[in-house]
Regions:
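Donor-nucleotide binding loops and adjacent catalytic segments primarily
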Residues: 55, 191-284
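Active-site and donor-binding regions of nucleotide-sugar-utilizing enzymes
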Residues: 6, 10-13, 17-28, 68-171
Length: 284
């Protein structure tokens, strides 16, 4: 079919992919839509799980890759990464000429997506606006809301909050979180049960995950990023003392991530906790 509408989805971090995987499939399979998939930010980096490998294994064709993350894991690096993202994504959108751009949640990379699209008069769709999380992420989420034209929110409370920000109620739609589709699929299909250690590897102890276990992911607090290492060491000590099998995931790329990562490595090397398995990514 000619004149398909081009929908550009920008994935900038590992959690964003699983959150919208079923939406990507729906766009890809729709006869009147063309999926333009842009992978950017930490989704391209091995130290943060290299999510692009899982995306391509799932059969998605990547339209563009945008390398935009600066080293440093501090507030200045976050600001510069955002600026670089605006520059690079502006070129991507200029060349692809999408009919709409989809951005997700509250990462600082997402505000770069929103700015680059909005200033080129490309309709912007924002997923999961209106949520309250605190920190800089909440400010970015609400800024994305004000730049967006269509809002796909995950709850009635979020919908009400977006409308109170002044957005047209006709364009605020409670779709729920699309990642629930993945949870339902796993629940409905026993064949999707797998050994996560065998599939994703990781380092640390061979924990017994077939009974009760914990899942831990601790990100740095960007307003207190200097304390990231101390914070994560406290959590690690507490989890080790619980002696419950635990999957521990690597932090994101926010300011303080270097301290969090350093704390994880040093604790693992010094104590080798018998109940913790450390993983970079877990993607269905």
């Amino acid at each position: 079919m000619k004149n398909k509408r081009k929908i550009c989805v920008v994935i900038t971090a590992r959690p964003s992919y699983s959150r919208v995987k079923t939406a990507l499939l729906a766009i890809k399979n729709h006869p009147q839509l063309e999926l333009q998939l842009v992978i950017a930010g930490s989704a391209l980096l091995g130290r943060y799980g290299n999510a692009i490998e899982f995306i391509e294994k799932d059969g998605f064709e990547v339209t563009e890759k945008v390398y935009m993350v600066l080293e440093g894991e501090n507030r200045t690096a976050m600001a510069k990464t955002t600026g670089l993202g605006v520059i690079e994504l502006a070129n991507v959108f200029y060349n692809l000429k999408p009919d709409a751009v989809i951005t997700i949640a509250d990462r600082f990379e997402t505000i770069a997506t929103s700015i680059a699209a909005t200033y080129q008069n490309i309709p912007l769709v924002h997923i999961q606006g209106g949520e309250v999380t605190g920190n800089i992420d909440e400010k970015v989420r609400h800024a994305n809301t004000k730049l967006a034209d269509i809002h796909l929110v995950a709850s009635e409370n979020a919908k009400e909050r977006v409308i109170k920000l002044g957005e047209n109620p006709d364009f605020v739609i409670n779709t729920g979180c699309p990642s629930i589709d993945i949870a339902k699929e796993v629940n409905d299909k026993p064949e999707l049960n797998f050994d996560p250690i065998k599939k994703y590897g990781g380092v640390g102890s061979e924990i017994n995950w077939k009974n009760e276990y914990l899942v831990v992911m601790q990100h740095p607090v960007t307003t207190e990023y200097e304390e990231a290492k101390e914070d994560v060491l406290k959590t690690l000590k507490a989890i080790a003392e619980l002696n419950i099998p635990t999957f521990w995931f690597w932090p994101n790329v926010d300011a303080g991530a270097d301290g969090t990562s350093s704390g994880i490595r040093s604790f693992r090397e010094l104590h080798n906790p018998k109940n913790i398995r450390f993983l970079k990514i877990w993607s269905h």
